[in-house]
Amino acid sequence: MDIGAQLAEAAQRLSVMCDAAIPVLEKKTIVAHATNPLNYAWPHHEQYLLKWGNRGGHTLLLGMNPGPWGMAQTGVPFGATGVAQSFL
């Protein structure tokens, strides 16, 4: 199995773990809503891993934009804050 496929498989396992953690977070903390982007954005994430995971790199940078222009502020994935502001 190539590296990209291994990364995709690992991401699927992580997604299952996140799905199991969400109800716990919602019950035990002040979190009202939680989503798992590995579910709703899976096809795109998998394509990314399969395409770029086999390029021989030694580092895979993953992250989230929690700043004032990111999903943590609006709940809108991929930083589409303009869309959220004009719609809401």
Regions flagged by a language model, labelled:
Residues 2-88:
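A polyanion-binding, active-site-adjacent surface
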